[in-house]
Amino acid sequence: MIDIKLIRQDPDFVKDALKKRGEDTDIIDEILKIDSEWRSVTTELNELRAKRNDISKNVAKLKKEGKSSEANALIEEGKRIGEEIKSLEEKEKELQSKLRDLLLRVPNIPHESVPVGSDESQNVEVRRWGEPRKFDFAPLAHWDLGPAWGLMDFDRASKLSGSRFTVMYGKLARLERALINFMLDVHTREHGYTEVWVPHLVKRETITITGQLPKFEEELYLTEKDDLFLIPTAEVPLVALHSGEILEEKDLPKKYVAYTPCYRREAGSYGKDVRGMIRQHQFDKVELVWITTPERSFDDLEQLVRDAETILQRLGLPYRVVSLCTGDLGFASAKTYDIEVWLPSYNAYKEISSCSNVTDFQARRGNMRYRRRSDGKLTLVHTLNGSGIAVGRTLVAILENYQQPDGSVKVPEALVPYTGFEVIP
């Protein structure tokens, strides 16, 4: 949630930021209208409360002086003012609710370093690592390799749960688990993250903090009886861990890592990546979250990206890093880098990690602050998040990039201690 003060002071700046995102700016005028009404009602309320207090003092004084009739007249006026206050309090509450709902629907302001563009075609490549492999045979897609071994089963997954689910057996199931453990070990032992085990079901207010609600409810799985949401990413519980808390600057940054399954309805992706494991309703991911200070958050974002890149480098998978343009930024993000791994089946780079600085957008929603060492002032933290990395897509990248002419796949050297085998099947 962006600061209402910014909208009041410089609405044109906010509108320009929304235009760069390709968003409608009418909501800013609506916010200013409701905000003006709310402030007017608040001013009137304060005046009436002050008047009621004066009446109470005067009633006591008049009673002391034995002026009962005058005191009774003031009491009646006080009752009338009390009714006005009650009515205005209800109106104030209603306007506050409307204002918050509107503010929750405004995306974050893109950072000045973000390239301006309308869609992903205008994202800017930052760097590449590794070279896509040149095959001297016709490589197979993962959706052909896995089923041919009898280790990847889309048909039975569909029988169990419908489309966009996968069942894996034997060595592929073990490879998935090996990747999770490998990623967690690198991030905790080498990068200094604290591993966290989090709930996979969260409250409505929790998932509002990270920005999925209220705008994207149709993309989430909801257990209606309990009004709990299945998490679309571990970012949700990790960021909200410190909601409503005051942290000390000496304890920042906090760096958390968590493995969870993630659940997404993919409501807006009909017809995209329909084959294989690239776009699933349920997938495994290792998530990285930083809680840091405004002064260092953009430097921390660069480190977060490097931490995610390390995984791909250790696995020997070619990738590139791109800076998302304004029109492709996520709702809560001020700046995002995508890491895209090379997939031979697409003859293209495909997203495997998205790393974002959300600035104080989530902190304002969740009232997450820290006490500055210099002056003791309470300030909103900045939050960062990134995939460290998507497990299923990493498995896919290994199968496709490490396949051999005989239809087998070599396991990357870094994973052999985790798998206990060097070749699949």
UniProtKB/Swiss-Prot annotation:
Domain notes: Consists of two distinct domains, a catalytic core and a N-terminal extension that is involved in tRNA binding.
Gene source species: Thermotoga neapolitana (strain ATCC 49049 / DSM 4359 / NBRC 107923 / NS-E)
Listed HAMAP family: Ser_tRNA_synth_type1
Catalytic activity: tRNA(Ser) + L-serine + ATP = L-seryl-tRNA(Ser) + AMP + diphosphate + H(+); tRNA(Sec) + L-serine + ATP = L-seryl-tRNA(Sec) + AMP + diphosphate + H(+)
Subcellular location: Cytoplasm
InterPro entries, per the entry: aa-tRNA-synt_IIb, aa-tRNA-synth_II, aa-tRNA-synth_II/BPL/LPL, Ser-tRNA-ligase_type_1, Ser-tRNA-synth_1_N, SerRS_1_N_sf, SerRS_core, tRNA-bd_arm
Pathway: Aminoacyl-tRNA biosynthesis; selenocysteinyl-tRNA(Sec) biosynthesis; L-seryl-tRNA(Sec) from L-serine and tRNA(Sec): step 1/1
E.C. code: 6.1.1.11
Keywords: Aminoacyl-tRNA synthetase, ATP-binding, Cytoplasm, Ligase, Nucleotide-binding, Protein biosynthesis
Protein encoded by which gene: serS
Subunit text: Homodimer. The tRNA molecule binds across the dimer.
Name this polypeptide is given: Serine--tRNA ligase
GO cellular component: cytoplasm
Function: Catalyzes the attachment of serine to tRNA(Ser). Is also able to aminoacylate tRNA(Sec) with serine, to form the misacylated tRNA L-seryl-tRNA(Sec), which will be further converted into selenocysteinyl-tRNA(Sec).
PANTHER family, per the entry: SERINE--TRNA LIGASE, SERYL-TRNA SYNTHETASE
Major localization class: cytoplasm
Record-stated family: Belongs to the class-II aminoacyl-tRNA synthetase family. Type-1 seryl-tRNA synthetase subfamily.
Binding site for L-serine: 233-235, 287, 387
EC class: ligase
Any one of the GO BP annotations: seryl-tRNA aminoacylation
SUPFAM superfamilies the UniProt entry points to: Class II aaRS and biotin synthetases (SSF55681), tRNA-binding arm (SSF46589)
Positions annotated to bind ATP: 264-266, 351-354
GO molecular function, one term: ATP binding
